[in-house]
Amino acid sequence: MELIEIFKALSNPTRLQILKGLKDPVKHFPAQDEGDVHTVGVCVSSIQEGIGLSQSTVSGYLATLQRVGLVEVRRIGQWTYYKRNEATISALAEIIGKDL
């Protein structure tokens, strides 16, 4: 786990907002037709609509969060879905609690 890279990813307010929103996606993002948001994840277009930024900007932010392991990605047909990687987030919380 690259802590510096994770903290860099979290230093952007919008990326942090996306990660927080994915914790309770029903509350923070519009409903989507395909799949349960807790199982499959949230579609990029729903995240885009909830955040209010362009799809390319949101996709870039999600790619950064994925690169550092904070979100998981799942592709179903032409759609890409994201959800939090709770294992990484729990490990990060444990490291912060013990080492910082």
Describe the function of each predicted region:
Residues 1-21, 62, 67-70:
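N-terminal leader segment of winged-helix/HTH proteins
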Residues 8, 14-54, 80-87:
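N-terminal helix-turn-helix DNA-binding core of bacterial DNA-binding proteins
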Residues 61, 78:
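Gly/Ser/Thr-rich helix-start
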Residues 67-76, 83:
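Beta-hairpin "wing" of winged helix-turn-helix
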Residues 88-92:
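Short, charged/polar, Gly/Pro-enriched secondary-structure boundary elements
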Residues 95-96:
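Residue-level signal for well-ordered alpha-helical positions
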